[in-house]
Amino acid sequence: MSTEGAKPSEMLIAACRSNNVDMLEEVVHQQEGDGVSFINNARDSLGNDCVHVCTKYGSLECLDWLLDISGVNLNNRCRMTGDTPLHFAVMFIKKDQETALRMVEMLMEVGADPLLTNNDGFRPIDLVPGDFHDVFASALEGPAPALQYSADVVADDDDEEEGSGESDEE
């Protein structure tokens, strides 16, 4: 693929699409200022960011490289469908189950939210074909689902109250 005359953002997307880590690194390191903003703001012609493109094309090495960068947005939504990178990773099962599962695991390890729905109201797990549901369901469980309940947890700082674990009785 020729990148001659291409804009840096186009080269970045091309690197993600073709799983070319060397090109990805080179383009990001050539940018002045905040590389994270450059990565998060680059889009393909359909409005997909770098993480979306990696998961759409099964670009494991580029995805791994991007996920090592603090601040890369894991939960951006595709402008057309509302799909997150986790949705794209799950849909990759049609091409390669092993790669799809690995991408889901990678995204979950760094905090992608499996509870986000796309424009049709589907979570990533809802898009998994029945034959693979159990395998992907366990991969999509992780620290992120617990976050939805964290607001329901109430701290009890009053050690005098019943149920505090301390007792005046002996």
Swiss-Prot record:
Q: Where are the ANK repeats?
A: 46-76, 81-116
- MF terms (GO), sorted A to Z: myosin I binding; protein sequestering activity
Where is it located?
Cytoplasm; Nucleus
Extract the Pfam families matched here: Ank_2
Q: Name one GO cellular component term.
A: nucleus
Q: Where is this region: Disordered?
A: 150-170
Q: Which PROSITE patterns match?
A: ANK_REP_REGION, ANK_REPEAT
Keywords for the protein's UniProt record, in alphabetical order: ANK repeat, Cytoplasm, Nucleus, Repeat
Please give the Gene3D superfamilies that the UniProt record associates with this protein.
Ankyrin repeat-containing domain
Put simply, this protein is called Ankyrin repeat-containing protein C105.02c
> From what organism does this protein derive?
Schizosaccharomyces pombe (strain 972 / ATCC 24843) (Fission yeast)
